[in-house]
Amino acid sequence: MVKGIDQFKAHFEAFNDRYVLIGGAACFLVLDEAGLDFRATKDLDIVLCVEALDAKFAKAFWAFVERGKYKNTQKSTGKKLFYRFFDPEDAAFPYMLELFSRIPDVLKLSDDAHLTPIPVDEDLSSLSAILLDDGYYDFIHDSKIDINGIPTVPPEIIVPLKARAWLDLTKKRDAGEKVDRNDIKKHKNDIFRLFQIVEPDKRISLPKVIKGDMESFLEAVSVDPPPTLKPFGLGGTKFDEVVELLRKIYDLRI
């Protein structure tokens, strides 16, 4: 389940062209639609569509933050344009909102709003770097679908996003940066869960950079494959079969 997603959906019903949900919330939506369970997730990863943003959306967003009485409101500094809001007083609201934008100061502050810088020693979302790349940004928005009134992306699109997030976190860990091993593991495990509902006859043409990332991901995870895929609903499926089919779906090297 995704705490507060119904509140979010109702509040932003008139702004479905301004954003797309990715990450764990997107996994929940596509798996739930297929009648499958997904791990609990407490945050909403929101990609803003800069071409459609306006003052009305910014006003509506700040109204949502104020209604939920979020205790912590943060903004990244520098190149990564990232907003984080968490720990609302109203328990009916999502615990955390993480917004990704490609233009600075997209959320004009309300008169009494204050954004503190995200601490340097706190890593930004593993999905934040994705939006700095034109290929990923267009890939997400060109693939947008609607599930129960919420704009998101289908499972075959979430898989490459999760693969890139896994690669980024793994690279940081290998460079000696502090990374929660569970954050790395969840992205890989989510891909196996999503595999249950990816249509085997799908064929996805990936932009060059995303294709390269998928290649790198499959090569890396093949070095240390899980002993069983049963926890992900794939008890009768071998790891090599998953890799082979993903290569076919995304037109990768066999």
Set out the residue ranges of the language-model regions.
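Compositionally biased terminal segments of proteins
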Residues: 1-254
